[in-house]
Amino acid sequence: MRDNLLFLKHALQEIKTVWSVTESSKYLVKKMIVPIPFCHNNLIVELGAGNGCITQALLKKLEGQSKMISFELHPAFFNKIMHLSNEQCTIVNDNALNILNFVDSQSVDAIVSWLPLANIGTKVKQAIITEVKKSMKEDWLFIQFQYSLYDYKFLKKNFKSVKVQFCALNVPPAFIY
């Protein structure tokens, strides 16, 4: 409940960067991580970690020498999830545009993004996707959640294959690309 109030407070103040009014449901989190092929040496990046609900779900699935880097730009949410840092997980208070300052080119196995693409200007959104693609291995996986299909064409233009799933058991319901 406290997390929902935190989301609502910051969404009302800064809707362009905090676009969710509640934390994501366990159903959405599960749908987001199911496609990730966890193995003993993954590098997973999370963009827009929020209150850490997916961060925690990803941490439970990491195996062996796998690592994860979670980006959260908003200070209140970053401070809330800092305690999740450990030898497998680094929490970063930085912009997704700076992903290559934290990972090598073509080194990331999967990126899970909670970024509010619909609220980000086209030039910045394109720059983020360009950096994401530079960071990914050849057989990479990019998972993005949104509350609408607004950016479907944008994602189709930037990625070879885009599949859409719907999660009705979330407030509001969400789409997963």
Which ranges hold each PLM region?
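Conserved class I S-adenosyl-L-methionine
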Residues: N41-G50
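Conserved SAM-binding strand-loop segment of SAM-dependent methyltransferases
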Residues: E87-L97
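A short acidic, Gly/Pro-enriched loop at the edge of an enzyme's catalytic core
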Residues: N101-I111
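Conserved SAM/SAH-binding beta-strand->alpha-helix loop
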Residues: H74
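Class I SAM-dependent methyltransferase Rossmann-like catalytic core
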Residues: D3-I36
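A short glycine-rich, Lys/Arg-flanked "PGG" loop and its adjoining helix->strand segment in the class I
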Residues: Q126-E138
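Conserved beta-strand signature within the Rossmann-like core of class I S-adenosyl-L-methionine
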Residues: M136-Q146
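Glycine-rich SAM-binding Motif I of class I
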Residues: G52-Q56
